[in-house]
Amino acid sequence: KLTFSCDVEKKDEVVQLFKDVKSKWGEIDFVVHAVAFSDKSELSGEYLNTTRENFLRSMLISCFSFTEVSKEASKIMKEEGSLLTLTYESTKAIPNYNVMGVCKSALEASVKYLARDLGGKKIRVNAISAGPIKTLAASAIGDAKFLYKWNEDHSFLKRNVDIHDVGNSALYLISNLSACVTC
């Protein structure tokens, strides 16, 4: 069995996931966290209209899940292992991103604290903030086409990042080539 399911909203499933991984493979070298969620209807309009329920659920799935996954993964991670997550533009208020911008800001802060906490175990913690990428998740953001075009026009390389660019960066960050790179 090469795949396991895990609902990151349920702590017991996160704990069980890493028990299952440990029983299958023993130790692990890395984890890539690529999890995010928000109610699509709350991404457009004003952030001010974010509901408490969506805020809490979005924060749990998009941010806290990385902390919980890191905690459990670090118990079975080899020395010089790597924890990696994906983020996007948390320093500016992006139209039609709303609560996800807040979640990504919290996620990026979490990366720093996890890097500090796990550095003594020689576990690296990093995040890739690649910019807007054409994915199914990104299609939920209103005006995504405008965002891609604006980014392409204003990037130094005059092009958008694609999934292959992100994959190459991820390979570097989870490999020993980045042995001294954390946060």
Describe the predicted segments one by one.
Residues 99, 120, 130-155:
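A glycine/serine/threonine-rich, flexible loop-to-helix segment
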Residues 36-71, 75, 79-120, 132-134:
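Catalytic loop of short-chain dehydrogenase/reductase
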Residues 119, 124, 181-183:
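Short, small/polar-rich loop/turn modules that mediate ligand/substrate recognition or access, typified
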